[in-house]
């Protein structure tokens, strides 16, 4: 069992770690007054309700209630243990961390196996790269890359490598270094023979592209065949390390550029990303052989608002663009589309016309989703033909009718009227027909029920019982004034009605008894339970008077203690009813007297 992290190390790490900087690696934050706000990473939202306080060094979401300090943020975001979060930040801020502390959480028994998988991937990334750059076996692969426009600088930047044309070289290479074959199969690096006689290498005679997770660790590979081998591209399978529906290629490198440019450029494949980065579009990322998912969108939305889609110009690429734009817009993203000329993908375009033209004429000249759709609707239609022209105009009007802004609708109606020499009035009239068709039937009863439900839900969230509010206010004053802690110890002790309140009070009592300095930062560092940490951030956000008057204190204490008596009265009344049912009138009379006594204590 590892030793406990010394308090002075925890304090040093917390003082050095800037919570705005740490959370800013995950969430796009904007300063509003003294605090910073962004979209909560713990629940879906389109309006920022996630607050970070640099003064108090805490975060709090007014939407879902998540909250805590820099350590609890990493615990909730990454699944770290407390020790892991302290160790991670100590490393980030170059603070010496004791060697005798066990960092990995016992709650993750698979972590040692995953660690071996990660080590194998990192080792192979370096080995594959060495084979490509420094050996005669890798010369053909290197020549291929150079002929395709890859520079040696780009090859080094993305650590591109080469897998030998061998069935068992990597198998022997890994076994010799102490890796289990079964574990490496689970990591996606080896394949078990059908007859069960052993294992063979998954990647053979391929140019190897390492795939990193969002923190920069290698978790998978994609191999491009050099000869006639099929498939042309082979990706690692899903593994405990690699989940393609949750990973965006190059995101760990692109994140800072995305923040700086305030946009992300999304491609369909990693080859497009590498070419785009060489063209100085460094905010480039890609999905890994899968359609855009909700998880991808959540990652993007936490970091940026504007997404430029740059997919292939074939039919499949157009349809993927439509699907991705719809998903992104539903989550509150501003979407634009980079239009590639027909028959080309982004990589082809860059090789044909150059990186500067790609950046200026394609990426920086991206269009709105509506403009892209208007171009898409033209495909396969002869606009000189009246039938095709009418079909096109109807398609465009239907799409315009789905736009939420009347100003935006007017812009495209004017554009349509000008292009086809039609009156704007007739188009607007037809537009109103489509707009009415878009509106769902209003079931007033159902609507009222839904509104009532939402109102009730909001009221439940906003209104708390009097005793609960009293406990929260007592805790808030205790956090601001040491003298209040002593008064609450004497009058309430541990008689808080809510378990989390009782636990937080225990922390405050301990600080008081130790004579320790009581600050939000010190208390947050001591609290390792996420529920208590969340409660603490919530309480710290409460607005209370600078001083607690004796009348207010007495009122809060009375509400807290009376609640326990109310609970006891209910229990006694239930016992009395049962005694009367059993015809035990002597016990019923005794219980009635106890109830009278309890009722008197409420006054």
Curated annotation (Swiss-Prot):
Q: Name one GO molecular function term.
A: ATP binding
Which E.C. number(s) belong to this protein?
2.7.7.101
Ligand binding (Mg(2+) 1): 268, 312
Q: Which reaction does it catalyse?
A: ssDNA + n NTP = ssDNA/pppN(pN)n-1 hybrid + (n-1) diphosphate
Name the top EC class: transferase
UniProt keywords (A-Z) are:
DNA replication, DNA-binding, DNA-directed RNA polymerase, Magnesium, Metal-binding, Nucleotidyltransferase, Primosome, Transcription, Transferase, Zinc, Zinc-finger
Question: Got a GO cellular component term for this one?
Answer: cytoplasm
Pfam families, alphabetized: DnaB_bind, DNAG_N, Toprim_2, Zn_ribbon_DnaG
Q: Which residues form the Toprim domain?
A: 262-343
Where does the record locate the signal sequence feature? none
Q: Which Gene Ontology BP annotations are present?
A: DNA replication, synthesis of primer
Looking at the record's lineage, which domain of life comes first?
Bacteria
Question: Which PANTHER family does the record associate with it?
Answer: DNA PRIMASE
What does the record say about domains?
Contains an N-terminal zinc-binding domain, a central core domain that contains the primase activity, and a C-terminal DnaB-binding domain.
Q: Under which name does UniProt file this protein?
A: DNA primase
What organism is the protein native to?
A: Bacillus subtilis (strain 168)
